[in-house]
């Protein structure tokens, strides 16, 4: 089976292609000009070289099969692998953006886009609140399949080449359980699509022994930890992984995470009614994160089919956030985007092609 050209970093292509400058030319065609056929690259390449590319590599290995649009402008995409027909989802989040013009100090309003990518089909972690785990684990995604999610979404929305995306590994799967492919995808996002590592966030459920491995790659990405509880008993009931990597084990590795000045580790905290949304829980969370440069992102539980949990009130979420902020721990409440199309946090899963999304 031919290798996907999107599976190769710039360095790998430079070593493979002769002369090596062909790699940079090819990267421009792939990631700046969105070409999906080697024949469309004839301006730079000879017929013999194009024949070589067609013989050795393939381009697109996934396709969009369904798109659902939310009232807030966000979109959920169902992708199908062209190799094994398995499906997976990704989400485009559309948000308002404000910037200050450095020359006039005027406030400029615009839009920013975040692509929530999947790194696995299904998930092995088995969090009880997450819809993804309902379908079980199928396989890891290749770097090329991760990259193509962003490429196809950008292409589908006619976003200009210069429009920067934010990438969050918060879709289906646990990124640290597919670390090699995730790291390769991050490198290609950076060198190919020109997405700064500062715009890329890797979210983990707490695979503690792989956090230092990710740190050692020196990729410069942002780290997010799915915490969701302030004691091991509650966290283990929500996230079985906690029985192997308990809260203190995870926090010990987070304390070693290299942070740039003014940067913080994000802790995601899913608020579930009458389980972990009390003021007492907020006080315990403050104590847990003492000494860690952190910020807390509160997520109100998003209901899904078969779930036993309930969404808390916005009032209780504000009380939780207000307490943390009053004590100097930066805390925000995440706006639930794409809730009406079941594309919010914890709502993605593999679907059969016959199913509507």
Curated annotation (Swiss-Prot):
Q: What is its EC number?
A: 2.1.1.192
Q: Which Pfam families match?
A: Radical_SAM, RlmN_N
Q: Which residues form the Radical SAM core domain?
A: 109-340
- Cystine links in this protein are 116-345
Keyword annotations: 4Fe-4S, Cytoplasm, Disulfide bond, Iron, Iron-sulfur, Metal-binding, Methyltransferase, rRNA processing, S-adenosyl-L-methionine, Transferase, tRNA processing
Protein name, UniProt field: Dual-specificity RNA methyltransferase RlmN
Please name the source species. Answer: Helicobacter pylori (strain HPAG1)
Q: Molecular function (GO) terms listed?
A: 4 iron, 4 sulfur cluster binding; metal ion binding; rRNA (adenine(2503)-C2-)-methyltransferase activity; rRNA binding; tRNA (adenine(37)-C2)-methyltransferase activity; tRNA binding
**UniProt-listed PANTHER family:** 23S RRNA METHYLTRANSFERASE, RADICAL SAM CORE DOMAIN-CONTAINING PROTEIN
Family as reported in the entry's similarity comment:
Belongs to the radical SAM superfamily. RlmN family.
Gene, per the UniProt record: rlmN
Additional note from the record: Reaction proceeds by a ping-pong mechanism involving intermediate methylation of a conserved cysteine residue.
Q: Which domain of life is it from?
A: Bacteria
Reported function: Specifically methylates position 2 of adenine 2503 in 23S rRNA and position 2 of adenine 37 in tRNAs. m2A2503 modification seems to play a crucial role in the proofreading step occurring at the peptidyl transferase center and thus would serve to optimize ribosomal fidelity.
Q: How many cofactors are bound and how?
A: Binds 1 [4Fe-4S] cluster. The cluster is coordinated with 3 cysteines and an exchangeable S-adenosyl-L-methionine.
GO BP annotations of the record are: rRNA base methylation; tRNA methylation
Q: Which reaction does it catalyse?
A: adenosine(2503) in 23S rRNA + 2 reduced [2Fe-2S]-[ferredoxin] + 2 S-adenosyl-L-methionine = 2-methyladenosine(2503) in 23S rRNA + 5'-deoxyadenosine + L-methionine + 2 oxidized [2Fe-2S]-[ferredoxin] + S-adenosyl-L-homocysteine; adenosine(37) in tRNA + 2 reduced [2Fe-2S]-[ferredoxin] + 2 S-adenosyl-L-methionine = 2-methyladenosine(37) in tRNA + 5'-deoxyadenosine + L-methionine + 2 oxidized [2Fe-2S]-[ferredoxin] + S-adenosyl-L-homocysteine
Identify the catalytic residues: 89, 345
The principal location of this protein is cytoplasm
> Could you say which residues bind [4Fe-4S] cluster here?
123, 127, 130
**Database matches in InterPro entries:** Aldolase_TIM (IPR013785), Methyltransferase_A (IPR040072), RlmN_N (IPR048641), RNA_MTrfase_RlmN (IPR027492), rRNA_lsu_MTrfase_RlmN/Cfr (IPR004383), rSAM (IPR007197)
Give residues annotated as binding S-adenosyl-L-methionine. 173-174, 203, 226-228, 302
Required co-factor(s) are: [4Fe-4S] cluster
SUPFAM superfamilies xrefs: Radical SAM enzymes
Q: Offer a single GO CC term for the protein.
A: cytoplasm
